Amino acid sequence: MRISIITATYNSEKTLFDTLLSLEKQTHPDIEYIVVDGASKDNTIKLIKSNSTKVSKIICEPDKGIYDALNKGIQAASGDVIGFLHSDDLLAYDDAIADIAKTF
């Protein structure tokens, strides 16, 4: 089962590293990770590109706020299940997404 995870970002370089790291540690084998950045002015995009091998798509363009950004991510997603991981959030443990997939 493919799980799509969407993170909306804007100038998130101070918090995003830990978010990316928590996703990198996930054990579920089929994760589509989409990051939607609202044209950050800091080093958010550079941080994403240099610290995450699981990012499937990066959408970087101005948006009308977090809900617009999340909707762009949903439109780009191809997973059976779609979830959100905000740029200052962490997944609690390494099997979190695998456990979510088991419920479906």
Q: For each of these PLM feature ranges, what is it?
A:
Residues N43, D68, D89-T103:
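Acidic donor-binding/catalytic loop of UDP-sugar-dependent glycosyltransferases
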Residues D37-K46:
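A conserved acidic beta->alpha catalytic loop
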Residues C60-A77:
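Glycine-rich, basic loop-to-helix element that forms the pyrophosphate-binding segment
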Residues S12-K25:
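Short, well-formed alpha-helical segments that are part of the catalytic scaffolds
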Residues I82:
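Short aromatic/hydrophobic "clamp" motif used to bind/position activated sugar donors
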Residues G38, L85-S87:
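Active-site acidic Asp-centered loop
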Residues M1-S4, E32:
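Cell-envelope/extracellular polymer assembly enzymes that use nucleotide-activated donors
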